[in-house]
Amino acid sequence: MDEELKDYYVPQIFRKVFCEHSKEQPRERGRKDRMKKIGFDNDKYLKMQSEHIRERISKFDNKLYLEFGGKLFDDYHASRVLPGFEPDSKLRMLMQLSDQAEIVIVIGAPDIEKNKVRGDLGITYDEDVLRLMNEFTSRGLYVGSVCITRYSGQNSADAFKKRLEKLGIKVYVLYNIPGYPSNTSLIVSDEGYGKNDYIETTRPLVVITAPGPGSGKMATCLSQLYHEYKRGISAGYAKFETFPIWNIPLKHPVNLAYEAATADLNDVNMIDPFHLEAYGQTTVNYNRDVEIFPVVQAMFEKIMGECPYKSPTDMGVNMAGNCIVDDEVCQEASRQEIIRRYYKSMDALMSGTGTEEEVYKIELLLKQAHATLEDRKVVPAALEREKETGAPAAAMELEDGRIITGKTSDLLGASSALLLN
């Protein structure tokens, strides 16, 4: 729900601040609106992205396992930093491939065991599996099955499996493998991937998605490749993630905004050294993919005989960078997003759910993006109102660019006064 809030600012002694964007609402014709500046061609993206995935399918034995990272629904981060990107673009892109696509939803047994909750929705991962199934099927997408990963006899995972099976949903299990992911000799063997269930699929494109990170999407893809090759099918693997965008500069504000969004995960964008060595081209990836690539490469070699990819960048299919039509608009939108993330991290710190390290990291990203807090128009407006009244104040920027403020009084808090104004 926080993504639906208007842009507002509440300065206090600890600078406890919220800065959120609203969902765009229908606007009156002819209204002046700075948000109408478009930096991203969404129609071009839908066409180019779906074509590129089809092309990747054709390079293998008409069978591609696509690890789908990030949010499929309501990707407001992408829509904020790439003005013109629709929050449901990735879902719409998949719908263009609906006749070829089959979805497998992955969930980790340890996450079921500890009732892991999605921070943005406030529901447990197992409940989100059912929500995702409903969302996909209501849009005409085929969900073939659910896969429980890292299984080691958890009772809660057994109960969840039975619950799904009673609903008529196919459920497969991937077991916890000792030494994963480094012990490739064991992993790529009958005692490793060989012990896992083989997920029966019927379509050329198998989209592997999950309620959240760390669910085992890549492990599921590689386990399936092992089983497919055992059956004589030369299936392939690819990775779909919007950020970081591989073919724009490392320190481009769009990529810096991704680092700000993942400050709590300690993700760091970096030049892909494997791609640079193989092709002499500079591309951007993030640390976790770069660090795991030698292991993934070794697994591919054991499964296929050779690795089809020379770098983590090669594995990706993201076309977003090719659809930026106004770079300056995207840069400015991304600077605004980094400022928003800074105040969100400050709020998390004050409420005890964040860390100083997150705040420090985003402060550094602000400097790298050549942005200041005052670049967000509501900030100086609220600070000025606070200075005038000597009490916390709030400011909101309307869609037409006007700034509204609210002050603290005996009757109302600053936010309440702001909304009334």
Each model region followed by its residue ranges:
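Hydrophobic positions on the alpha1 helix immediately C-terminal to the Walker A/P-loop
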Residues: T220
